[in-house]
C-alpha cells in the first residue's frame, strides 16, 4: 500500500504537534458539580453556586443514562467535515427537535430546591410547548437575551449544554480540519466561555478555548484576542491571591475580554465553575469599560452579582 515518506524533521514535528481539539471528560458535569460545591464554601454567592452544582449534577445523571432520541445524521456529519463546517452547528440543530428529550430528562432529574423563583422558572420551562422551547433556545444560543425570560437561562442553558456534549462525545473528530484564528468552536460554532492554560506534558503552556455549549476545547495561540484577533497591548487583570487561578485577557481594540484559567495556579480548576466564582472580576472589568464577550449558559444576563 502506498504511503507518504516523512523526513526526520517531519517525524519530530508530527510527534510534537499538540492536538487541535480536546474532548471533555465523560464525567464533565460531575466534576463541575463537585467544583461548584467546593467553591461555594465561604463564598458570598454560596447559595447560587450550590444551586448550579445541583444543575450540573442533574446534567451528569442524564449524560450517564440518556433518553432515546434521534441519532445524528451521519451523512450530514460527513458533509460538514468535508466542507470544514461545524458538525454540530448550533444555529441549525437548535431549531430541530433532537435536543428536546434531553431537556425533559434533565427536568425530571433536577432536584428543584425550595426556592420560589427557581420553582417558577422550572415550571415555566416544563409547561412550555416545543415551539416555545425552541424559540427560547434559538434566542439563547444567538445571544438575544432580551428574547427569553432571564430566570430560564441557567436551566435551558444546562439542557442545551447536556445535549451538545452528549452529541460531541459520539463524534470521531479525526476528520476535523484545523484552522488558524478559530474564534468560534469548530464543532458547534458557539463562542468560547473561557480559555484554559495547560501546565503539563505536551500541552504545557498552551491555551485552549473552551466552548460555552458543547465543552470542546480547541487550540488558540496566546497573546491574541479571541474576539477580534488583535495582538496589541493586551492586558491581564486579576485579583491578587485569588485561589481560582483566573486572569482576564482584556483587549483595548474591541474593549472585550475573556477569562483565562491557569491550571498551574489552580491544578484542580475547571473553567465554568471558576468563571461563576469570579463574577467580582466581571464587575471590575465592567467598571473599567470592558464588555464581556463570552457567554456562560448557566449565568442569567444582568445577574452577575
UniProtKB/Swiss-Prot annotation:
GO molecular function: ferric iron binding
CDD domains: FdhE
InterPro entries the record matches: FdhE-like_sf (IPR024064), FdhE_C (IPR056796), FdhE_central (IPR056797), FdhE_N (IPR056774), Formate_DH_accessory (IPR006452)
Keyword Iron included in the entry's annotation: no
Main location: cytoplasm
Swiss-Prot/TrEMBL keywords: Cytoplasm
Location(s) in or outside the cell: Cytoplasm
Keyword presence, Transmembrane helix: no
GO terms for cellular component: cytosol
GO biological process per UniProt: protein maturation
Function: Necessary for formate dehydrogenase activity.
Family affiliation: Belongs to the FdhE family.
PANTHER family xref list: PROTEIN FDHE
Protein name as annotated: Protein FdhE homolog
Organism of this sequence: Stutzerimonas stutzeri (strain A1501) (Pseudomonas stutzeri)
